[in-house]
């Protein structure tokens, strides 16, 4: 990959601590920080604004989930600082990322903070926005296609569909350390609402059990997707009652997105029993 970058965990921390002391020098006066959504991985799903800002940046501070294909859109001369996290592995703590963005912005640099998906959906973009703007640095959000949309488009099915799903909810399946999953199970257990569950692989058995206990059909279709829209994409189909066991038999690379709902049976490669399509609803859906 072209450009100046650092890849291992210890070096990531060092790169972040070094802040604006690298080769790129800031312009006179205040810089700016843009929190940019990289989308699910396919570079063609970047917005035009995201692409323009990446090409105009002095430095790109990027997450682990940004694909190599998207990173290749960054000009070779632009400095890159990796600050990615993985489950249980945070070489650069969030507070340090916030401080780095402030330091770079105060140095007069044009900073692209590049995040997988959309920075406003489970991306901690709000925390970074608050830190940057509190320091008086101009900052904007640049939306990206979130993982749920990327998965749906890649597998060729809708997230809502007349007669099948009248709503969509984005939910985190991740729990804080030693804490319970703090979810409103009763409101989530609505078969007419598609659930997009992020970061839930480790807790999917509990999630499925609680949804079923609160009234969600046990045979509701579920699609698990890893690295949606990229050449490395992997999918797994199951029912709600079977998804945890299916994932144990065939683990997918993290992070895994789960689409729970009748629309999941409309995915192009779904081999679930035909009765799960609820044909009486599909007649209504296709009107």
From Swiss-Prot:
Record carries keyword Iron: no
Reactions it catalyzes: uroporphyrinogen III + 2 S-adenosyl-L-methionine = precorrin-2 + 2 S-adenosyl-L-homocysteine + H(+)
Organism superkingdom: Bacteria
GO terms (BP aspect): methylation; siroheme biosynthetic process
Pfam families in UniProt: TP_methylase (PF00590)
PROSITE patterns in the cross-refs: SUMT_1 (PS00839), SUMT_2 (PS00840)
Gene3D superfamilies registered for this protein in UniProt: Cobalt-precorrin-4 Transmethylase, Domain 1 (3.40.1010.10), Methyltransferase, Cobalt-precorrin-4 Transmethylase, Domain 2 (3.30.950.10)
The protein's enzyme class: transferase
Alphabetized UniProt keyword annotations: Methyltransferase, Porphyrin biosynthesis, S-adenosyl-L-methionine, Transferase
Polar residues composition-biased segments: 1-10
Entry binding sites for S-adenosyl-L-methionine: 40, 116-118, 146, 199
Region span, Disordered: 1-24
Molecular functions per Gene Ontology: uroporphyrin-III C-methyltransferase activity
Assigned EC number: 2.1.1.107
Pathway assigned in UniProt: Porphyrin-containing compound metabolism; siroheme biosynthesis; precorrin-2 from uroporphyrinogen III: step 1/1
Job description of the protein: Inactivation of uroporphyrinogen-III methyltransferase results in the loss of nitrite and nitric oxide reductase activities, but not of nitrous oxide reductase activity. Likely involved in heme D1 biosynthesis.
Family assignment from sequence similarity: Belongs to the precorrin methyltransferase family.
Protein name: Uroporphyrinogen-III C-methyltransferase
Lineage per the UniProt record: Bacteria, Pseudomonadati, Pseudomonadota, Alphaproteobacteria, Rhodobacterales
């Amino acid at each position: 990959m072209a450009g100046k970058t650092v890849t291992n965990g210890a070096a990531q921390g060092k790169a972040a601590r070094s802040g604006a002391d690298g080769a790129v020098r800031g312009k006179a006066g205040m810089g700016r920080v843009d929190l940019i959504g990289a989308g699910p991985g396919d570079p063609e799903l970047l917005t035009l604004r995201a692409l323009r800002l990446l090409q105009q940046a002095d430095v790109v501070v990027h997450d682990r989930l940004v694909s190599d294909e998207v990173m290749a859109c960054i000009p070779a001369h632009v400095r890159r600082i990796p600050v990615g996290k993985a489950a249980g592995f945070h070489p650069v703590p969030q507070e340090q990322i916030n401080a780095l963005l402030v330091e770079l912005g105060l140095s007069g640099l044009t900073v692209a903070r590049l995040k997988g998906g959309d920075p406003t959906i489970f991306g901690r973009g709000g925390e970074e926005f608050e830190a940057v703007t509190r320091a008086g640095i101009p900052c904007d959000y640049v939306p990206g296609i979130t993982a749920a949309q990327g998965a749906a488009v890649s597998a060729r099915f809708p997230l809502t569909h007349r007669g099948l799903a009248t709503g969509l909810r984005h939910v985190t399946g991740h729990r804080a350390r030693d804490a319970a999953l703090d979810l409103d199970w009763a409101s989530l257990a609505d078969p007419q609402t598609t659930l997009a569950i992020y970061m839930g692989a480790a807790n999917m058995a509990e999630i499925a059990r609680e949804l079923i206990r609160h009234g969600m059909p046990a045979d509701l279709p579920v699609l698990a997707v890893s690295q949606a829209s990229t050449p490395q994409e992997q999918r797994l189909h199951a029912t709600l009652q079977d998804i945890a066991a299916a994932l144990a038999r065939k683990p997918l690379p993290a992070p895994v997105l789960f689409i729970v709902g009748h629309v999941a049976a409309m995915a192009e490669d779904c081999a679930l029993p035909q009765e799960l399509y609820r044909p009486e609803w599909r007649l209504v859906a296709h009107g």
